[in-house]
């Protein structure tokens, strides 16, 4: 499969198309009812301003910038999401590896792009979705107790990297495009978290970390680690 074959060159993410159209029509009907239904126009103006603000926030949330990494991807791990680095630590990974791994976590706020990218080139070895809670995504337990999707990728060098999409207090739906056996590449979308919240990347111990705590990341652009 070509490197850019699955890359969707769109400005609004496909996961947001139906939501944005439905929201636009609903807000239009509400504002039309207020405008034509009451003589006093003050409530209409207040609701109209609020409607525009809410809709612009939703458009911002579902935006889908076209990004190409543009550099050599060998042994490179890129940020799978826009956001802020909230965890860099060794942890026990008990779903797939059952050993110690280096975990780098990116928290996405409501104003971040919520499309997720593959962090490495490789072949998809495992995809799993787990139902769970919707506690705040920055809490340590969120990684194992919240609703989440796990994708394991084996790089061309034979290194396995686990990426976990995690829903938060607001997020209620995780979308994952990965399928076992497919090849995946940096520059391609791995999925989308609707109104949520965190992505964890599990790497082998000894991996060179290229980011710091609190650093802001740009999905598919920021190099977060280099594999040995």
From Swiss-Prot:
Gene Ontology BP term (one): phosphatidylethanolamine biosynthetic process
EC number(s) from the headed UniProt entry: 4.1.1.65
Membrane-topology annotation of the record: Peripheral membrane protein
Cofactor remark: Binds 1 pyruvoyl group covalently per subunit.
Principal localisation: membrane
Oligomer status and interactors: Heterodimer of a large membrane-associated beta subunit and a small pyruvoyl-containing alpha subunit.
NCBIfam families for this protein: PRK05305.1-2 (NF003678)
Protein name: Phosphatidylserine decarboxylase proenzyme
Organism: Bacteroides thetaiotaomicron (strain ATCC 29148 / DSM 2079 / JCM 5827 / CCUG 10774 / NCTC 10582 / VPI-5482 / E50)
Lineage per the UniProt record: Bacteria, Pseudomonadati, Bacteroidota, Bacteroidia, Bacteroidales
